[in-house]
A protein has these predicted regions:
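Acidic-basic catalytic patches of nuclease active cores, encompassing PD-(D/E)XK
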Residues: 1-22
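Short acidic/glycine-enriched loop/turn segments that link adjacent beta-strands
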Residues: 26-29
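Domain-level recognition of nuclease-like catalytic cores that cleave nucleotide substrates
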Residues: 79-106
Length: 106
């Protein structure tokens, strides 16, 4: 897990989420974080930038990334039948310094 993923995980843990998987491989895709809080599963794509010189970290998400994250996330959840019936949501987390900004991917 890289620095940005660790900072994002800390951010989500403070909000009551617990980690189910990090850097989980689903076919040729990778899911940065898969989290759970109550009956909600949250799949998170994490992007990090060290400074402001080259824009915001969330600008690194191209038009195809949400589709890939949704496809991989659905595959990961399907492979875990104990999670059937839970709400599944998808987000991107942009990490800059110690600040984490969250945006929905759906």
């Amino acid at each position: 897990m890289n620095r940005g993923e660790r900072l994002a995980l800390r951010h989500y843990r403070r909000r009551g989420y617990r980690l189910l998987a990090a850097n989980a491989r689903v076919g040729r895709y990778e899911l940065d974080l898969v989290l759970r809080r109550g009956r909600r599963i949250l799949v998170v794509e994490v992007k990090e930038k060290g400074g402001d010189a080259f824009g915001h970290p969330l600008e690194m998400i191209d038009d195809e990334k949400p589709r890939r994250v949704l496809t991989a996330g659905a595959g990961w959840v399907a492979a875990h039948p104990e999670l059937t019936g839970l709400e599944v949501a998808f987000e991107a987390a942009g990490v800059r310094g110690r600040h984490v900004e969250r945006v929905p991917l759906t």
